[in-house]
Amino acid sequence: MKLCRYGKDGFEKPGMIDSDGKLRDLSKVIGNIGPAEISPRGLKNLARIKPGSLPVVAGNPRMGVPYVGIGKFVAIGLNYSDHAKEAGMAIPSEPIIFSKATTCINGPDDDVIKPPASTKLDWEVELGIVIGTKARHVTKEKALEHVAGYCVVNDVSERAFQLQSSQWDKGKSYDTFGPIGPWLVTTDEITDPQVLDMFLDLNGKRMQSGNTRTMIFDCAHLVAYVSQYMTLLPGDIITTGTPPGVGMGVKPDPVFLKVGDVMTLGLQGLGQQKQKVVAYQG
């Protein structure tokens, strides 16, 4: 299933994408899409619904974050070997974990705000893993049983903030730095998350092109690893790192986002995002 939320910010309704790509209204069936709805029981109930029985949503409404109740926004750094190389950093021997503040979460096509002091604003197309059941000290073999589905994430990053110290969070957590969606695609449709093509264009020019097969640590490894250090709860999301092609890595001169730039990004089977960079308005 492809689950989503649509409508004005703060007034989103739950939706479902049918096999023809049409947006269907779920609001007469469920009030919202959150941890209960993406639990195994919740997804089983939703799977019984025939999309053709739901009203078609007219027009092209704004797409919101595809679900609510994100308690933790966990991120993995340098998880593609070529990206580590372009960043001038050693390939990690174990996953690098950091956090993005949940206040940075943004709709998939909403504007990205350039902070007033920003000088090195950058992009990162990533695969997001959405947790569906509590995971604590799980094995790699069982890890994906705790996953509800997958999303597109843009791990927007201010490199000047990020590299001021060994802690990356402040370069990753500004408001609007966490676009998620447009859909939460359940594991019945994404049976193997390690074969997904991914891309990011800047103003129509291809900057990133990769595939999740080149992750250093795959999705099962990441869920199992993170669960050794914190309990993962339904609704938590792990964003899994980015392939090469970020602005910081462009040679000979890095390229950073400026006001007016447009990012278009996506992953195979998970939909696309599009964001315009805008100035901070106070």
Spans of features found by a protein language model:
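Catalytic-pocket segment enriched in acidic/His residues
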Residues: 5, 9-10, 47, 53-56, ...
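Structural signature of FAD isoalloxazine-binding scaffolds in flavoprotein oxidoreductases
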Residues: 90-108, 123, 257-269
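N-terminal non-catalytic cap/leader segment that marks the start of a structured domain
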Residues: 1-95, 262-264
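A structural-propensity feature for long, helix-poor, extended segments
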Residues: 107-128
